[in-house]
């Protein structure tokens, strides 16, 4: 059963074959990415934004919406928003203001969210997303606007963790009021079969950009970066957009791709059978399917009006230019420079990018490892470990500095490559720094020739037939003795030195 078929079965939905979808329809995407900014305090009050605090301990009258409390704008959040807009090639407007987005839901105790509506801080930008085939897709940005995050609801007694079937709900307002920037794309049209890949590549490129700017930790698993994926289909050859759905709070790069593809197939099946798409929000499930949420509101439903308790924001051109000077080398430019420095092919660089290894390799090189050794570790052994654990390379419990330390131990002759892998496994298991793991596990190479010679003599005595072949000139047979010695020494002997001693003992040195 394919992944799509399994998802359809789990959801109880009909899916149209993907090839038929892209033959009959043109997908139109719109991506809205919410990013929590790494400021010390919240958007409109002095409460801390630290993740993981005890529920409802990082709150005050402002973020709880108590009567008489007034918001005070966080300047650092505004500056982060401007830097993001500049990095996205946006126009930073000379004047913008906040608005109240009115809705009744327990995650926002004021019954409105302070956001920006028709006057955002940044407009009309773009981001070039690298694709797997080495090309790029330019995603146009409609706007980037500031707002406050909502509280977090936990539904109890429900098998799905959602409100349906729950016996109660718990609310944590620690997140309420945390600074957010929402980045909204213009419709992505013409992507065809590559639409899911483009969605994932765009979110990946955006994550890398925000990480380089150091404005957010962009931890999708912790909710500091969340993607809402809008998907609609229109019959091939037509110009009018179809009815869209919005899959909310997709929380991993892979899930963005899966959610878009699933919605294309689900909507394709409905349209192919003569049905109509309902404009609604949808929930993404880790099993790879979406389910209906609520009927999608329009802007009019939120009754936006200017926030009366905050003055408009008018960033001076001097401030904008000063912040422009703080924009670091952007990820795709640094990758191009790194590729030239390392002298690797486009194919090798593309593999490193797709694996999420470029920055990790570069950081390992900065700590003293050669680029060849760093690429080998992150691109092979560590990539395998990450794949086995179902996590990203950057989520492994090992740092570039630690990988560089392992490389140094190999270069110094203290470890062989096979022993180095055992050391890395120890680091991943939390056993300490590489040299500590090497010592604690007794993995250092044996450098004492007398001990190695004793192991060689013992192996030759145990294998007289092989020893006679070597003495007779069949030096290739030495490999069997070398293997026996390496086994006896648990891989801690220097294989090259063992071979030398074997040949010398058999008169072939």
UniProtKB/Swiss-Prot annotation:
GO BP of this protein: glutaminyl-tRNAGln biosynthesis via transamidation; translation
Keyword Aminoacyl-tRNA synthetase among record annotations: no
Gene3D superfamilies: 1.10.10.410
Enzyme class of the recorded protein, top EC level: ligase
Gene Ontology annotations for the cellular component aspect, listed alphabetically: plasma membrane
Enzyme Commission number, as recorded: 6.3.5.-
Reaction catalysis annotation: L-glutamyl-tRNA(Gln) + L-glutamine + ATP + H2O = L-glutaminyl-tRNA(Gln) + L-glutamate + ADP + phosphate + H(+); L-aspartyl-tRNA(Asn) + L-glutamine + ATP + H2O = L-asparaginyl-tRNA(Asn) + L-glutamate + ADP + phosphate + 2 H(+)
Alphabetical list of PROSITE patterns matching this protein: GATB
Keywords per UniProt: ATP-binding, Ligase, Nucleotide-binding, Protein biosynthesis
UniProt record similarity statement: Belongs to the GatB/GatE family. GatB subfamily.
Description of how the protein assembles with itself and partners: Heterotrimer of A, B and C subunits.
Function: Allows the formation of correctly charged Asn-tRNA(Asn) or Gln-tRNA(Gln) through the transamidation of misacylated Asp-tRNA(Asn) or Glu-tRNA(Gln) in organisms which lack either or both of asparaginyl-tRNA or glutaminyl-tRNA synthetases. The reaction takes place in the presence of glutamine and ATP through an activated phospho-Asp-tRNA(Asn) or phospho-Glu-tRNA(Gln).
Name of the protein described by the UniProt record: Aspartyl/glutamyl-tRNA(Asn/Gln) amidotransferase subunit B
Organism placement in taxonomy: Bacteria, Bacillati, Actinomycetota, Actinomycetes, Mycobacteriales
